[in-house]
C-alpha cells in the first residue's frame, strides 16, 4: 500500500510540474549572430519551458528554417512545429548577406512540408489552441509578431507576456532587432500586451569567453559539438570577438525573471526621424500621463554570473528528455 501511495504521489507531482511549465513560442533569426542558436538550445534544455513552436524571421528565412530544424533534430525535438516567417520587414527591405553558420547545412538538411507554412499563421493557431495563455519570445526583428497581432487581433488575451531581446534603453543606440523592422516594433510595443524587453545595454554584459567558453567546448555530446561548430564559423568572421549572449538572456528571463532587475513604463519606437530611426524611447511609469498604462518592463540590471552558470549547466548537459 505504501508503494502504491508513493507511486500515486509521484505521478501527481509530475503532472503538476508539467502543468506549471511555461508554454512559449520562440521566434528567431537564427544564423546571423551566434546567440540565436544558443538561445534555442537553452530553451530546449530548460525543464521550466515547454516550447510549443519555433518560427524564423527576416532575410533568408528558408535557410534559417533548415538550420533551426537541424538543431531541433540534434536535441531530439522534431515534434516541435516549425514555420518559415517573413523574409522582409514591413518597411525598407535591405539586401541580406549569407550567414556563415549556414555552412553546416548539407543537401540532406531538408525540412518537412509543414515547415513552409507562414509563421504568423502558426503563431495564431498555436495561441488559439492553447488552454492557457502563452509567452512569446521573439529574439529577432518583430515582423512575425506584428503580423500575427494585425492578422489575429483576438489573440491578445492568449498572450501572457512577450519577452523580447531588443532595444537600448539607457543609451542612444539603434539596436538591430528594433531598427531592422521599426514599424513592426512599434506595433508590438503599442499593442497593450505585457512586454519584458531585454535590451542591448544589459545583454552586452553577458559574454561567453575564457573558462566559460572552454567549458562549453569541452562538453561531449553531439548537440554541444554542433553549437561549438557554429561558434567556430561565427568566429571566423569575427576573429577578435567572443559570443555575447543577447538572445539567451531573453530566453532565461522568460522562465527565471529574477535574473534581471526591471523597471516599469512605456516604450515608443522612433519611426519617422532618419537619424533616430529604430531608437527605443522609455518613459518610467511615474512619468506617464494619466490614462497611459505602463505595459512594459525594461531590464536594468542582470545577475551575470548567475545567468552564465545557468546557461552553461543547461548547454553542457546531454539533450534532455522532452
Language-model features: where?
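Active-site histidine-anchored catalytic micro-motif
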Residues: 20-30, 34-70, 109-211
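Metal-dependent C-N hydrolase catalytic cores
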Residues: 20-21, 63-129, 294-303, 307, ...
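Glycine-centered secondary-structure boundary/capping sites
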Residues: 14, 73-76, 257
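Conformational coupling and interaction surfaces
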Residues: 20-21, 39-45, 50, 179, ...
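Hydrophobic h-region of N-terminal signal peptides that target proteins for export
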Residues: 9-18
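Histidine-centered active-site/metal-ligand motif
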Residues: 36, 101-102, 144, 246
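Acidic/polar N-terminal loop/beta-strand segments that form early-domain functional surfaces
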Residues: 55-59, 85-87, 272
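Sec-dependent signal peptide recognition
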Residues: 2-7
Amino acid at each position: 500500500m505504501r508503494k502504491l501511495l508513493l507511486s500515486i504521489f509521484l505521478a501527481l507531482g509530475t503532472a503538476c510540474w508539467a502543468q506549471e511549465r511555461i508554454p512559449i513560442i520562440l521566434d528567431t533569426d537564427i544564423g546571423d549572430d551566434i546567440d540565436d542558436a544558443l538561445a534555442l538550445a537553452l530553451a530546449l534544455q530548460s525543464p521550466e519551458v515547454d516550447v510549443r513552436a519555433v518560427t524564423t524571421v527576416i532575410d533568408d528565412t528558408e535557410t534559417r528554417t533548415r538550420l533551426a530544424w537541424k538543431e531541433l533534430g540534434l536535441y531530439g525535438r522534431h515534434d516541435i512545429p516549425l514555420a518559415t516567417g517573413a523574409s522582409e520587414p514591413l518597411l525598407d527591405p535591405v539586401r541580406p548577406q549569407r550567414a556563415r553558420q549556414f555552412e553546416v547545412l548539407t543537401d540532406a538538411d531538408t525540412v518537412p512540408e509543414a515547415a513552409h507554412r507562414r509563421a504568423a499563421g502558426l503563431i495564431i493557431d498555436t495561441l488559439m489552441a492553447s488552454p492557457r495563455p502563452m509567452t512569446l519570445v521573439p529574439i529577432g526583428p518583430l515582423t512575425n509578431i506584428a503580423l500575427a497581432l494585425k492578422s489575429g487581433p483576438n489573440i491578445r488575451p492568449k498572450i501572457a507576456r512577450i519577452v523580447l531581446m531588443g532595444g537600448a534603453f539607457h543609451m542612444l543606440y539603434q539596436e538591430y532587432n528594433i531598427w531592422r523592422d521599426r514599424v513592426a516594433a512599434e506595433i508590438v510595443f503599442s499593442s497593450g500586451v505585457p512586454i519584458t524587453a531585454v535590451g542591448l545595454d544589459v545583454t552586452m554584459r553577458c559574454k561567453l569567453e575564457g573558462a566559460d567558453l572552454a567549458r562549453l567546448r569541452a562538453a561531449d555530446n553531439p548537440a554541444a559539438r554542433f553549437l561549438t561548430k557554429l561558434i567556430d564559423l561565427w568566429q571566423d568572421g569575427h576573429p577578435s570577438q567572443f559570443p555575447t549572449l543577447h538572445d539567451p538572456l531573453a530566453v532565461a528571463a522568460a522562465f527565471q525573471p529574477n535574473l534581471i532587475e526591471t523597471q516599469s513604463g512605456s516604450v515608443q519606437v522612433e519611426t519617422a526621424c532618419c537619424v533616430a530611426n529604430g531608437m527605443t524611447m522609455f518613459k518610467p511609469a511615474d512619468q506617464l500621463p494619466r490614462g497611459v498604462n505602463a505595459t512594459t518592463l525594461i531590464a536594468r540590471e542582470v545577475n551575470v554570473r548567475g545567468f552564465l552558470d545557468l546557461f552553461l549547466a543547461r548547454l553542457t548537459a546531454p539533450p534532455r528528455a522532452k
